């Protein structure tokens, strides 16, 4: 059953990506469409063995959206998520730190644009903790078993955080996709 849900998610986001791509051909200056496209790419990246390329593509689409509408809070938040995800996937500490810093900057801008968003504020808090999570925390107990336990907890926490970021991205992308599919009322 879980595999069926995964396949359905894959199909939904692949469809959203194709729709956004077709819409882009008609109107390349639609910031909302670019944001939906990037959200779909971020979700699809979860199904890739090498997700970094798809995340970079999402970052480019979000960059385009922000050139069109620099105050688009959901695009600011999504690009922050993309950088956060990219940082966690990076084995190079400098590259990871750079991406965590960019994520923090974009989350801060999203908070400034929509200060009432608890999700944006929590994302900003998470981004500030990302470097420590990425390195596995600071040196702690001298006992090997205690150290192993701490690493396991840190690793589990890292995956929990990454899961919540992905879930939040999924919710935003789904809402954006649903909003784009609502019929226009005629008056």
UniProtKB/Swiss-Prot annotation:
Stated role: Central component of the receptor complex responsible for the recognition and translocation of cytosolically synthesized mitochondrial preproteins. Together with TOM22 functions as the transit peptide receptor at the surface of the mitochondrion outer membrane and facilitates the movement of preproteins into the translocation pore.
Modified residues (N-acetylmethionine): 1
GO cellular component, one term: plant-type vacuole
Transmembrane parts of this sequence: 161-178
GO molecular function list: protein-transporting ATPase activity
Tissues of expression: Expressed in roots, flowers, young cotyledons and leaves.
UniProt induction comment: Up-regulated after antimycin A or rotenone treatments.
Protein name according to UniProt: Mitochondrial import receptor subunit TOM20-4
Annotated source species: Arabidopsis thaliana (Mouse-ear cress)
UniProt motif AKR2A-binding sequence (ABS) required for mitochondrion outer membrane targeting: location: 179-187
Residue ranges that the UniProt entry lists as topological domain Cytoplasmic: 1-160
UniProt lineage: Eukaryota, Viridiplantae, Streptophyta, Embryophyta, Tracheophyta
Superkingdom of this protein's organism: Eukaryota
Main location: mitochondrion
Key word Flavoprotein present: no
Post-translational modification note: The N-terminus is blocked.
Additional free-text comment from the UniProt record: There are four genes (TOM20-1, TOM20-2, TOM20-3 and TOM20-4) which encode mitochondrial import receptor subunits TOM20. In mammals and fungi, the transmembrane domain is located at the N-terminus while it is located at the C-terminus in plants. The overall orientation of the protein in the membrane is therefore inverted.
Gene3D superfamilies linked: Tetratricopeptide repeat domain (1.25.40.10)
GO biological process: protein insertion into mitochondrial outer membrane; protein targeting to mitochondrion
Cell location: Mitochondrion outer membrane
Record text on subunit structure and interactions: Forms part of the preprotein translocase complex of the outer mitochondrial membrane (TOM complex) which consists of at least 6 different proteins (TOM5, TOM6, TOM7, TOM20, TOM22/TOM9 and TOM40). Interacts with a variety of mitochondrial precursor proteins. Interacts with AKR2A. Component of a mitochondrial large protein complex that contains, at least, MIC60, DGS1, TOM40, TOM20 proteins, and petC/RISP.
Record's keyword terms, sorted: Acetylation, Membrane, Mitochondrion, Mitochondrion outer membrane, Protein transport, TPR repeat, Transmembrane, Transmembrane helix, Transport
Tagged with keyword Acetylation: yes
Membrane-related topology note: Single-pass membrane protein
Disulfide bonds: none
PANTHER family cross-referenced by the UniProt entry: MITOCHONDRIAL IMPORT RECEPTOR SUBUNIT TOM20-1-RELATED
